[in-house]
Design a protein with these regions (language model features):
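Intrinsically disordered, low-complexity proline/glycine-rich segments
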Residues: 2-295
Length: 295
């Protein structure tokens, strides 16, 4: 091969390599996710993540009294009763931490009990909040005559829309539960999803379906005695930061799922017997206000 031919061959190889790199970059372009993380998290057409519920004293080690005080000073979303209990891993690195308002759930009276999750990034900046909406949940539970039907609101830091995740009342005993929600896309159109618990599962496995009933993701759960781990995957054409956030918070919710159902069942009974007068938190009440009201 002549020197000129060798140079041409070298340029061709470089062009092919650049094209391949560009193609890989396009395939791993996930809205709201850095290219570096996406490149490592995308495999076989799916975006992968892990939600790991801590079963060691890592919580106290990393978020003891001193660091709690420092974190509260850094973010007003990190309240004094915030208990960090899970981490989110994407592309092999920790990208998020999930906590809940411990006092609101563990210590509050029945009518004041609220389940509030918060998702932070690695540096403890707020990314999202998931709230159990007592008003909507009680309304649905009353309508279903005692079948616990929970509604959760998900508010993310970069979205103008709130996502409402609801448990379906269309459930027979011993059959899988379903949850539904929708996300507004970049063109202002809703994209609907359903999360269905697998009929045969040992650790809280769920499958994600799109509005056409196609399987587009899965949550593979491994529940331990005092913790758990969920390995999630979503088809890359559906994956964006908002959907990933909903699924990550939903995974963390699973260790509270049974308690949440029992709470709504108990509240429904107490309200029906006149033992409790329902009350809504001011922040939740704001979500029900008429957006066209005179201010």
């Amino acid at each position: 091969m002549t020197a000129a031919a060798a140079r041409v061959s070298s340029r061709v190889d470089a062009a092919v390599s650049d094209a391949a790199n560009d193609a890989r970059g396009e395939l791993t372009k996930i809205p709201g996710v850095s290219k570096a993380v996406a490149a490592k998290a995308v495999r076989n057409g799916y975006y992968h993540f892990i939600v790991d519920i801590w079963i060691t004293d890592l919580n106290f080690t990393e978020f003891g009294v001193y660091k709690r005080t420092r974190n509260r000073a850094k973010s007003r979303q990190f309240t004094s009763d915030m208990d960090i209990f899970a981490e989110v891993i994407e592309g092999g690195e920790r990208t998020g931490l999930i906590g809940y308002r411990e006092d609101l759930w563990e210590k509050a009276e029945s009518k004041d009990k609220r389940l509030v999750f918060k998702l932070f990034n690695e540096s403890l900046n707020w990314r999202a909040t998931m709230d159990l909406m007592i008003g909507r949940s009680l309304q649905q539970t009353i309508a279903s005559r005692g079948m616990p039907v929970m509604t959760y609101s998900v508010n993310t830091d970069e979205d103008n829309f709130i996502v409402y995740l609801e448990r379906s009342a269309n459930k027979w005993p011993l059959l899988p539960e379903n949850f539904g929600f929708f996300i507004m896309d970049g063109e202002g159109k809703p994209q609907f999803y359903r999360i269905k618990r697998d009929l045969i599962n040992l650790g809280g496995d769920y499958t994600l379906y799109d509005q056409q009933g196609k399987n587009v993701g899965h949550l593979d759960g491994k529940v331990f005695s005092i913790g758990g781990k969920w390995k999630g995957k979503v088809r890359v054409e559906h994956a964006d930061r908002r959907l990933l956030t909903v699924l990550q918070l939903f995974s963390a919710l699973q260790i509270f799922n049974a308690d949440s159902r029992r709470h709504m069942k108990r509240l429904w009974k107490d309200v029906g017997r006149g033992k409790v007068k329902p009350a809504l938190d001011a922040q939740e009440a704001d979500l029900y206000k008429n957006p066209r009201r005179v201010r």
